[in-house]
């Protein structure tokens, strides 16, 4: 939290960085069994009830360092158990008898904040810990009443609403001892940097800071220097991660206007449990949804122009399985944790290659198998090669028997 390290040489990029925006680990302690983490019995019960048996790579490295109170920067891709890593660390450190907010988690989207809240509540099921989602798009008055009635032990929220509640003193920073930034690359990108900084100014100077992210652009690390003290750096390497178990293919569609027919053909060929189709713009989401409906295909759509209630209903239907295909933008690429998603279709390749992992990391989470299909026009070929190089992966042309793989 001191900025005294700014005098370091910048020749090799930020301190603690390897080239290519990857952090260099400085922590090698691994605990590969949940029983050896000295967790409370009621928390362990919740963890096992949630279905965890063995900690993932990031959990083996990061849970203990978080519980010990260190500032931690952890880099690992989607689907590797980052959420449970900090949820377990928070729940272990909460004093249940103290009816005050003791941990604050920030996430870039409302959906991700709600997803984190669900995980915290499930893992803390036998403890009686309270967790509240403090997000935009919901009724402010109702939120104020809730916070005034009894402060929740844990708050998970989006930066705008959290800052508003802190600023108006409905949320007290007095007992907050742990501050978590999830998907920090997204949060610290232009949109939220100032808000996070404002929130940080309101916290105690000895608050523990934990930052989790799939990608680590150098500007994120520069920002971490401003408010983290000698952080533990934990890297779970790209090649150890979630692209494993996900078969990736591309379909050549020479021209943009042929994508719709190709998608409809695919739809008829495959038996889809659940699929997500990613598109780059909100307007195009509406356009494709309309076209699919006109051809009698059942799909639902979601993007940032919709109000929160509508988005909640659509997510609920998709999670419960009553809606099977969801068309969406990158808004959802971070934070949709639907266990049954077996297929991701990139109708448009992401404009930002970092988002590729967030999109296809939806299928095959925690070792489940998944398939990702990329629709590629002539203009997209260079982007596809760029993605292959960046992730050190190979994306093959889609085979005719693709139905057998899903």
From Swiss-Prot:
Sites bearing Phosphoserine, chain numbering: 4
Gene Ontology cellular component annotations, sorted alphabetically: cytoplasmic stress granule; nuclear stress granule; perinuclear region of cytoplasm; plasma membrane
Residues found modified as Phosphothreonine: 158
Broad class of enzyme this protein falls into: hydrolase
Residues the record lists as N-acetylserine modifications: 2
Keyword Transferase carried by entry: no
Top-level division of the source organism's lineage: Eukaryota
Residues recorded as bearing N6-acetyllysine in the entry: 118, 174, 193, 238
Domain Helicase C-terminal residues, every copy: 245-406
Keywords linked to the UniProt accession: Acetylation, ATP-binding, Cell membrane, Cytoplasm, Helicase, Hydrolase, Initiation factor, Isopeptide bond, Membrane, Nucleotide-binding, Phosphoprotein, Protein biosynthesis, RNA-binding, Ubl conjugation
Disordered: annotated span: 1-21
Cross-link (Glycyl lysine isopeptide (Lys-Gly) (interchain with G-Cter in SUMO2)): 146, 225, 238, 309, 369, 381
Pfam family, one: Helicase_C
GO biological process: positive regulation of transcription by RNA polymerase II
Span of the annotated motif DEAD box: 182-185
Motif Q motif in this chain: 32-60
Domain Helicase ATP-binding residue range list: 63-234
GO molecular function list: ATP binding; ATP hydrolysis activity; RNA binding; RNA helicase activity; translation initiation factor activity
Family from the record: Belongs to the DEAD box helicase family. eIF4A subfamily.
Task performed by this protein: ATP-dependent RNA helicase which is a subunit of the eIF4F complex involved in cap recognition and is required for mRNA binding to ribosome. In the current model of translation initiation, eIF4A unwinds RNA secondary structures in the 5'-UTR of mRNAs which is necessary to allow efficient binding of the small ribosomal subunit, and subsequent scanning for the initiator codon. As a result, promotes cell proliferation and growth.
Protein name per UniProt: Eukaryotic initiation factor 4A-I
The organism's taxonomic lineage, starting at the top: Eukaryota, Metazoa, Chordata, Craniata, Vertebrata
């Amino acid at each position: 939290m001191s900025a005294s390290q700014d005098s370091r040489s910048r020749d090799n990029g930020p301190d603690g960085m390897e080239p290519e925006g990857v952090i260099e680990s400085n922590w090698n302690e691994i605990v590969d069994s949940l029983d050896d983490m000295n967790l409370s019995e009621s928390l362990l019960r919740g963890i096992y009830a949630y279905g965890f048996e063995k900690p993932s790579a990031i959990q083996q490295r990061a849970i203990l360092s978080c519980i010990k109170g260190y500032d931690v920067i952890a880099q690992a891709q989607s689907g590797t158990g980052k959420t449970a890593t900090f949820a377990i660390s928070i729940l272990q450190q909460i004093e249940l008898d103290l009816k005050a907010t003791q941990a604050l988690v920030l996430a870039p989207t409302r959906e991700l904040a709600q997803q984190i809240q669900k995980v915290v509540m499930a893992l803390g099921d036998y403890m009686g810990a309270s967790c509240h989602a403090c997000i935009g798009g919901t009724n402010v008055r109702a939120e104020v009443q809730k916070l005034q009635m009894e402060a929740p032990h844990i708050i998970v929220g989006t930066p705008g609403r959290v800052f508003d509640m802190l600023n108006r003193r409905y949320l007290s920073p007095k007992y907050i001892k742990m501050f978590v930034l999830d998907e920090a690359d997204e949060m610290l990108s232009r949109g939220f940097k100032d808000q996070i900084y404002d929130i940080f100014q309101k916290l105690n100077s000895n608050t523990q800071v934990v930052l989790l992210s799939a990608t680590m652009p150098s500007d994120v690390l520069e920002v971490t220097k401003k408010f983290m003290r000698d952080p533990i750096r934990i890297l779970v390497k790209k090649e150890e991660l979630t692209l494993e178990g996900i078969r990736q293919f591309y379909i050549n569609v020479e021209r943009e206007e042929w994508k719709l027919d190709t998608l409809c053909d695919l739809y008829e060929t495959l038996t889809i449990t659940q699929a997500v189709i990613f598109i780059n713009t909100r307007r195009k989401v509406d356009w494709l949804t309309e076209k699919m409906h006109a051809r009698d295909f059942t799909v639902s759509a979601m993007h940032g122009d919709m109000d929160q209630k509508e988005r909640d209903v659509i997510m609920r239907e998709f999670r419960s399985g009553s809606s099977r295909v969801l068309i969406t933008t990158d808004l959802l690429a971070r934070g949709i944790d639907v266990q049954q998603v077996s297929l991701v279709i990139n109708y448009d390749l992401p404009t930002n290659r970092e988002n590729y992992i967030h999109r296809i990391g939806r299928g095959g989470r925690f070792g489940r198998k998944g398939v990702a299909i990329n629709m590629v026009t002539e203009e997209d070929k260079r982007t596809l090669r760029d993605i292959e190089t960046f992730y050190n992966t190979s994306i093959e042309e889609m085979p005719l028997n693709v139905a057998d793989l899903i």
